[in-house]
Amino acid sequence: MKRSMYAGRVREEHIGQEITLKGWVGRRRDLGGLIFIDLRDREGIMQLVINPEKVSAEVMATAESLRSEFVIEVTGQVAAREQANDKLPTGAVELNVTALIVLNTAKTTPFEIKDGIEANDDTRLRYRYLDLRRPEMLENLKLRAKVTHSIRNYLDELEFIDVETPFLSKSTPEGARDYLVPSRVNKGHFYALPQSPQITKQLLMNAGFDRYYQIVKCFRDEDLRGDRQPEFTQVDLETSFLTEQEIQDITESLIARVMKETKGIEVTLPFPRMKYDDAMALYGSDKPDTRFDMLLQDLTEVVRGVDFKVFSEAPAVKAIVVTGAADNYSRKDIDKMTEVAKQYGAKGLAWVKVVDGELNGPVAKFLTGIQEELTTALVLEDKDLVLFVADTLEVANATLGALRGRIAKELGLIDNDKFNFLWVVDWPMFEWSEEEGRYMSAHHPFTLPQEETAHELEGDLAKVRAIAYDIVLNGYELGGGSLRINQKDLQERMFKALGFSTEEANDQFGFLLEAMDYGFPPHGGLAIGLDRFVMLLAGEENIREVIAFPKNNKATDPMTQAPSTVALKQLEELSLQVEEDETNKTN
């Protein structure tokens, strides 16, 4: 029989109709001779009723044999429930079954197919096809589909052209590690899976496409965390002849459309703008969460004269005030925060509490001479907790920024119903890498420097500023973009500033430099992390919850066992040899 509709879409207007439904058995209950079954499909749950007085003995026997996750087909008449279930969209109706067929049986599942399960992540990923049957997972992926549909429609309206770019590309330095693909035809040569379509989309601007977009898979071989995966999806945009502001306007309108169509939320435009230096100074992060206060405050000069060398001789002393939280944190709790501080490079964490108008705590005795000044500067009140970090400015900002977010979660200071978007602008072009011992691109080496600082490409690289912009949502980097270099001489200067010799630049990027000899237009763009965006819209804390088949934190797939070893013959065809891991060798 042909399915009449989805089980989750049956409503009161269907009462009296004979329909056929297909799906999975959720629960089976035997009550007073009747059998009740929750039939589940992708749209929801429908209650089935099998009455022995109204069905054949064969149907009754089949119903009695049903177990969870059996796949069945049922036909019957829609009727009103005697007692409606307000928790279900189908709760006012039920199906009086007249025919029942088992389409497939099922073993006992390793976890219940319901929301709020306690199975560990690897078990869920091992049986991902079962995990995806759970309503919340179905809803997450349906939300993702709505988001991509909304994005495509909007960009199509603005005459952006959807162009596919290659997955097999060239490995280039800078940024995260590439995933490499050996070439069988060209022995000893490797493709790289793209970390982004950055260069190819710029070349599309040179080709005259003017407005390009793509919802595209990208790949980065990096350490994983909750909002990262080795393969991820981004909404990639590039435009010609537009200003930084015009690109941001398009992006804001795109996000506003998505928020309205998928969540029914009206967002206020334009989004606030914050300079990079201000974000770091006030929030200790280049992706500030503005849903709560607790701003970082600079006390370097206030404490300069105190008889406490940790403060008086430190390059910077900064603090956050946790309002009214003195009783929330014991010394043991603060010791735990000190360990967190050390993870960010801080040597320790100083603190005081305001108790009956006086400062109490390990460093309070050093601050008695400036208590009034400190109280005024920090606007202190009774029961406040003050946390200090004395270190370099970078360490102080990073440490207090991390503690700020941690404390806000612990104290429930964050309104999870808020969506606070903002732009972080006026970025440094370069950032110092301790690991590499040199300056590296803060974004990528194709970013256009601000004209008034471009002369420092041959001078102090720390002073070069980029025409770059990141869009931030609730403490997450949602995406980033910039205007791009389109002049060959400036691009060559950029490569030189990054330590490339002329030969190295030509070897890695010669095709791009050559393209700049042929009328490369001014251009710029942006990329939005689709997985992260949907994660935030869905109220999840890990992008695995909005990806159908993700990897775990070891970049492996417990279901398929990828990555796996391959046959020796395959390696020989690629002229590859795998060295045995020293830790696996036996003596």
From Swiss-Prot:
GO terms for biological process, alphabetical: aspartyl-tRNA aminoacylation
Entry's localization field: Cytoplasm
UniProt enzyme class: ligase
Keyword Lyase recorded: no
GO cellular component, one term: cytoplasm
Keyword annotations: Aminoacyl-tRNA synthetase, ATP-binding, Cytoplasm, Ligase, Nucleotide-binding, Protein biosynthesis
Key word Cytoplasm present: yes
Pfam families: GAD (PF02938), tRNA-synt_2 (PF00152), tRNA_anti-codon (PF01336)
A GO MF term: catalytic activity, acting on a protein
Enzyme Commission no: 6.1.1.12
Functional description taken from the UniProt entry: Catalyzes the attachment of L-aspartate to tRNA(Asp) in a two-step reaction: L-aspartate is first activated by ATP to form Asp-AMP and then transferred to the acceptor end of tRNA(Asp).
Protein name: Aspartate--tRNA ligase
